[in-house]
C-alpha cells in the first residue's frame, strides 16, 4: 500500500509539473526555439532555462551535461528544482544573457552544421555572453527576497513535502552510520566459530575409528621375518621361503639373526643350520661358475697351439667322403734348414723320381719362382713343388706316392681311371712329419724337403688344429 500511495503522489506531482510547463510554453518567446526559432519546441535545457526544438536538443546533448542538460517536456519526469530553474530563466531572459553581443544584422542559421557552430559559440565559448548582466542578476537576487515560484498552494505543499522527505532520509543515514561502529564484530565471529566446533564434535565422536589395515604385500618383499619352529633338533623353514621363487639371494635375503622361539629350547643349533643352508644356497651359483671356468681353462690349454708341441698322440677317425685318412702327423718345433738354402728365381732344381710332377707329366726338373723362407709351399707361379724320394717311399707316406710305380692316382695309365677311396686312406695313413732331423737340401734324395719323414712319432694333426 505504501508503494501505491507513493506512486499516486509522484503521478500527481508530475501532472502539476506538466501544468506549469504548459503555462510557460504559452508565453510568446517560449513558443519558438531559443536557438533556431523553430515553432513548437517540446524539449528544454533546464540548467540553462530555455525551450528548444528536437534538432537543437540533439546538439545540446553533444555539448555535454556540464554545459547543457536536456529533458523532454512531455515524456520525462521533472523535479521541483528543475521547474524552478525554467521559471526563473525562460527564453526571454536567456536571449538577453547569451545573445547580448549578437550583431544587429545577424541571420540565424538553418542548416544542421551551421546551427551546431552557432550553439557552440553561444553556450560553450560564450562568444555573445553579457558579463555585466551577471553582476546585475547577482545584486538583484541578493537584495530581493525569494518569492514563491507558483502562487498555487498545491505546488508549494508538494515542494515542502519533498524537502521533508529528503531531510528524513538524511537523518536515517546518519543514524545508520552511528550504529555501525558501536556493533562489535569480533565477538560475533568468535561465537560463530564456537558453535561450528560444537556441531562438529558430536559428528566426530559418533563416527567409529577404523582400524589400521596392514598393507597387502603381493611379492612378499616387505613382510616381517617369521621365526622358524624348532622341534627338538629339527628345524622347519618359514612359509615365506616356499612362496619366494627366487630364494633369498635376489630380493628377500634371510636375516642374519633369527628371532628366538616361543618355547624355552635353545636356538643355537637352529641358527647354525639356517646359516649353513643359506650359505649353501648362495654358494650354488658361485661354485658352478668357478668349476665351469676351470674346465674351460683346461680345454683352452689343451686346444691351444702351444700344447701341439707335445708328444702325445690322439687318434681320430676320418669321415666318409674325405680323401684324407687317419693320420699320425707330428708338428716340428724347429724350422727346417732346407728352405733357407733354396736357390733364387730361374735356377732349375732336380726333382725326385716319385713326385706329383712326374704323375702330371712334367719334366724331372722344374723352375722354382722365388726362394721360400720357412714355408712348405712355393710361389704360385711354380705350379707344383718337387719333393724328394723319401716322401714317396715304398711305405706310401704322402700324396706324392701317386707318382710311384703303382700309379694309383696317375692320369697317364688308362687301367685306373677312377680313384679308390679305400686305397687313398690306406696310403695316407703313413704320412707323418718329422721333428728329429732337418733336411740338408732340396736336391738331395736321401733327405726330406720340408722335414717330412716316415717316422710316426709326434701328435696327430687333426681338424681341431685349424679351428
UniProtKB/Swiss-Prot annotation:
Residues making up the signal peptide according to the UniProt record: none
Renumbered residue ranges of the record's region Disordered: 145-224, 408-467
UniProt topology in membrane: Peripheral membrane protein
Compartments where located: Cell membrane
SMART domains linked: ArfGap
Oligomeric form and interacting partners: Interacts with ARF6. Interacts with clathrin heavy chains via the clathrin box-like motif.
Name of the featured protein: Stromal membrane-associated protein 1
Gene source species: Homo sapiens
Primary gene name: SMAP1
